[in-house]
């Protein structure tokens, strides 16, 4: 389907983004709304950051992005740990909260931060399309297992024309079958 849509950029990006969100939904349930929240928040913060005049306005927006992202990450990863530590230091008891750790939260949090930091440093210009940004943050091959890809490395590739030569196709098929063979052994 992706190759059939090779001349329709928006349809191709929409297709992959929807499937990325679907796969994330299947692994994390309604926590895919968290992925959407981080995506929308950082997209608009980067837009504001690019238009902001003055050092302190830009700095404030990047600090807001850091606070939102790291705050969510800290809540899901460290609330029970810190609650237990504080309770033991105070000589009390702590009942762990029922907090489900969303799959890949560290990866998409730091990937989204990479974008806002790159925009803050003026290494890249902010994307004008929320869909392109959602594609970058939710790209399923790296969403749940990494690696974290820098925005300045990934984003320029989004608009590149899709071209697959016979040699590239053959190499891809070879790598897929090699991987399947290695898994079977």
Locate the predicted segments by residue:
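Membrane-embedded transmembrane alpha-helical bundles that form the catalytic cores
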Residues: 1-185
């Amino acid at each position: 389907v992706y190759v059939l849509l090779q001349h329709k950029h928006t349809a191709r990006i929409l297709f992959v983004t929807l499937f990325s969100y679907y796969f994330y939904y299947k692994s994390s349930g309604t926590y895919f709304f968290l992925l959407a929240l981080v995506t929308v928040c950082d997209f608009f913060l980067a837009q504001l950051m690019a238009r902001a005049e003055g050092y302190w306005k830009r700095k404030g927006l990047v600090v807001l992005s850091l606070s939102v992202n790291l705050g969510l990450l800290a809540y899901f990863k460290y609330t029970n740990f810190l609650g237990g530590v504080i309770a033991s230091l105070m000589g009390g008891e702590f009942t762990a909260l029922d907090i489900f750790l969303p799959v890949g939260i560290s990866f998409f949090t730091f990937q989204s931060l990479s974008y806002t930091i790159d925009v803050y440093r003026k290494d890249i210009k902010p994307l004008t399309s929320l869909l392109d940004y959602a594609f970058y943050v939710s790209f399923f091959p790296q969403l749940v297992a990494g690696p974290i890809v820098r925005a300045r490395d990934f984003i320029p590739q989004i608009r590149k024309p899709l071209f697959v030569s016979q040699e590239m196709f053959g190499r891809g098929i070879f790598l897929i079958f090699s991987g399947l063979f290695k898994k079977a052994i």
